[in-house]
Each structure stands twice: as structure tokens, then as C-alpha cells.
Amino acid sequence: NPEGGTKNYVFSTHDTHSELCNAIRVVKGYRKEKWGYFLRAESFYNVATKEEEYGGIDSARYHERSHGEGFLALAQNNLQPNGLYLFDEPEAALSPQRQLTLLMEIYKCARKGAQFFIVTHSPILLGIPGADIYCFDDGKIHLCEYEETESYQITEMFINNREVLLDRLLKE
């Protein structure tokens, strides 16, 4: 489902299929995931509604929480060892503090055998220990170090040179 959820979620509130789905090929190997979840910050509301409907998870009450707290709870409730997880810009829903919480949850789950594919611009989530980071530069995909990512470099530049940077950016 392009909006998110498990492989069993079949719903669509808006046709958002990407051409990327035509370029992906699933290859079965020795390891089979026992659980999987696709989570996007932008379609959280729809997935949370279906999660409550499909799973009958009344106790989660995702819609009674703030966007970030509900998103984090949905992620936490669906992380399991030996799972396969696709997260699309999860930082869009989370404060820096909650990004650290998600980082801890991902790290703990990965140590128990889960695999994660995370598309992110967050220097916090890029910092997950042991993560392989792939950068997309000039139409090429390559492994890169944490400190080589644009997200890290821009954040570092802002923190270390905020006044100079803002002066240059906002100068009329």
C-alpha cells in the first residue's frame, strides 16, 4: 500500500503510486521477514485510522495524541524483531527529542534482527550506530560516511556559525 501499513493493508485515500514501484524487484533469499511495515509521516492519519479499524487497537488511540506522539506510538507498536521496515521521512512528524526516541527503538530492534530502509534528511536518524548510509548525488547512489551527508554538514554549519550564516542569508 503506498500510504503505509503492513502488506495486508488494502486501502487508498489518494492514488499516490510512484514509478519507483516498477523498478523494484523483490528477491527471496534464505531469510524471510516475519513482519513488515511501511510508515510515512505524511500519510500517518490515514494509516492510523486503518490501524485502529483493522487491528481493533482501541488502547492506542493514535488520533487522541499529537501528530508526533501518535506517529511515534504507531511506530513503536509495530516494531518487532526479524521485521522489515520502510520509513519515509519519519522526522517530519517528530521533534528532535522524539527522533532520539525513535533512533533508540530502531537500534534495539535492529540488534534483534530487524532490517530498516529509512529515507531521511535527519542528522539524528542518520546517526544510528552501524547504519549503512547511501547518498544520492548527481544521479548516482553511493555509500557515504555520516559526516559526508549534506544533512550533517548543513546542521553542523548552522550550529557552529549561526549568526554569520543568518547574516548572509537574510542580508538585503
Residues covered by each model-derived region:
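ABC ATPase nucleotide-binding domain signature region
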Residues: N1-E53
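Conserved phosphate-binding elements of NTP-dependent enzyme cores
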Residues: L20, I24-V26, R61, A73, ...
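Residue-level preference for the first positions of well-ordered beta-strands
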Residues: G36, L84-L86, Q115
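A short beta-strand-to-loop transition that corresponds to the Sensor-1 phosphate-sensing loop
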Residues: E42, T120-S122
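GG-anchored amphipathic helix commonly corresponding to the ABC/SMC/Rad50 NBD signature/C-loop
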Residues: R65-F87, Q97-C109
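Conserved D-loop beta-strand region of ABC ATPase nucleotide-binding domains
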Residues: D88, I118-V119
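Short loop immediately C-terminal to the Walker-B catalytic DE motif
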Residues: E91-A92
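C-terminal lobe/lid and adjacent interdomain/linker elements of RecA-like ASCE P-loop ATPase modules
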Residues: Q97-Q115, S122-E172
